[in-house]
UniProtKB/Swiss-Prot annotation:
Protein name: Maltoporin
InterPro entries: G_neg_Bact_CarbUptk_Porin, Maltoporin, Porin_LamB, Porin_LamB_sf
Function text: Involved in the transport of maltose and maltodextrins.
Entry similarity comment: Belongs to the porin LamB (TC 1.B.3) family.
Membrane association type: Multi-pass membrane protein
Record field: transmembrane: none
Signal peptide: 1-21
Positions bearing the site annotation: Important in sugar transport: 140
Catalysis: reaction(s): beta-maltose(in) = beta-maltose(out)
Domain of life: Bacteria
Organism, scientific name: Mannheimia succiniciproducens (strain KCTC 0769BP / MBEL55E)
One GO-annotated biological process of the protein: monoatomic ion transport
């Protein structure tokens, strides 16, 4: 309740300042679905994977509400306050209460040093920082978002430089030389005690350097990034033996504009040790299970075959090779063609395939899904939103490892499911 009142108070204060000047942006989706096996809509995702092809395959109500306002303006200089509160619920009943997530609250000072760094922006606070993603499967492959600070868009003449630092904290990842007596009940119902090391959080800082808008060919631009993650603790505490402590990630992304009426992005990334847990740019230096490296290649984009037909596509290869032999390789491919009947009605087909290969055994888990959707949207672009869609989704999987993850959920290791439903999606 306190968090809800805080959100209302922030929104009210911003509107009270100057209602006409407040920017309101956001994202939302919700709907209803049924599963052939009975019950509510089931999400179809490969066993061991972190992403799924999303058309006709999202089972939650999710929303982000962004309020922002320019608080200062003097010539080319301006100060902007931005905020973002997000909600996620299971879309099961009428009244579903949840605590909001305070995803963003930051201030951006544009042209803060106009004479020295024209066009550059100084910022501080919690922020979605220059995120890069594959829309089809909601996969954010370069995302260091969190509390932080930085200077971005420093014009070097041949490109733009951005510098930032953000933080993500691991709970209970360190120990101290002190111990606490912990009581527990044994298998015979007797009260026993043992001594356990005191735990404290691990603080992971990520230092981010990006050089963007490098013109390398006609309508083609290159972005280069280096992220270094480093863990530190409070005085008197230490990382667990074998903890990765630090690591780095290198990213190269080439964006080709005017590509068959759309665009193409090719991405190559390499990460080590603490940067391999999430494989996105966040660091987990307190972990003892992420020593190793990761290589990822992505090709994704949108093409327009005719005024009536557009298509999204994605190809992903990601290999995480860990010293403890617990890594995996992820293969993914998907397409989403769209046929436009008119400016506000279209038909979409999404075909997606994911495979996870276990490092230790070489065994593989596979999942393929196909979705057919009839859609009504605000415009004739594949990016047009809001949209309301009626969909049917068929998924088939075949698991060879971690089978209990599937069977404990009431499914067979090799099985299939059909899902149908209605969903809206909007961004503004």
């Amino acid at each position: 309740m306190k968090k809800t009142l805080l959100a209302v108070a922030i929104g009210g204060a911003m509107f009270a300042t100057s209602a006409a000047a407040v920017d309101f942006h956001g994202y939302a989706r919700s709907g209803i679905g049924w599963t052939s096996g009975g019950g509510e809509q089931t999400a179809l995702k490969v066993n061991g994977g972190g992403s799924k092809y999303r058309l006709g395959n999202e089972t939650e109500t999710y929303a982000e509400f962004k309020l922002g306002q320019e608080l200062f303006k003097d010539g080319n200089k301006s100060i902007y306050l931005d905020s973002n509160i997000a909600y996620s619920i299971d879309q099961q009943v009428d009244w579903e209460a949840t605590d909001p997530a305070f995803r963003e609250i930051n201030v951006q000072f544009k042209n803060f040093a106009e004479d020295l760094l024209p066009g550059a922006t100084l910022w501080a606070g919690k922020r979605f920082y220059q995120r890069h993603d594959v829309h089809m499967n909601d996969f954010y492959y370069w995302d260091i978002s969190g509390p932080g600070a930085g200077v971005e868009n420093i014009d070097l003449g041949f490109g733009k430089l951005s510098l930032a630092v953000t933080r993500n904290t691991e709970g209970g990842g360190t120990a101290t030389y002190g111990q606490d007596k912990v009581y527990y009940i044994d298998n015979n119902g007797q009260i026993q005690y043992r001594y356990e090391d005191r735990k404290a959080d691990v603080y992971n800082d990520v230092f981010d350097i990006r050089l963007a808008e490098l013109n390398v060919n006609p309508n083609g631009k290159l972005e280069i990034g280096f992220d270094y993650g480093n863990a530190h603790t409070k005085n008197g505490y230490h990382l667990e033996p074998g903890a990765s402590k630090n690591g780095y990630m290198i990213t190269l992304e080439h964006t080709q504009g005017e590509f068959f009426g759309g665009f193409n992005k090719f991405v190559a990334q390499y990460a080590t040790d603490s940067m391999t847990s999430w494989n996105t740019g966040h660091s987990q230096g307190g972990s003892v299970n992420n020593n190793g490296d990761m290589l990822r290649l992505i090709d994704h984009g949108v093409v327009q075959f005719s005024p009536k037909v557009e298509m999204m596509y994605a190809l992903i290869y990601e290999k995480t090779d860990l010293d403890n032999n617990q890594g995996k390789t992820w293969y993914s491919a998907g397409i989403r063609p769209m046929y436009k009947w008119n400016k506000t009605m279209s038909t979409l087909l999404e075909v997606g395939y994911d495979r996870i290969k276990e490092q230790s055994s070489g065994k593989k888990n596979d999942l393929a899904k196909v979705t057919l959707a009839q859609q009504w949207q605000a415009g004739d672009s594949i990016w047009a939103r809001p949209a309301i869609r009626v969909f049917g989704t068929y998924g088939h999987w075949n698991d060879k490892f971690n089978i209990t993850d599937r069977t404990n959920a009431g499914y067979k290791a090799k099985d299939a499911e059909f899902v149908a439903g209605v969903q809206f999606e909007a961004w503004w």
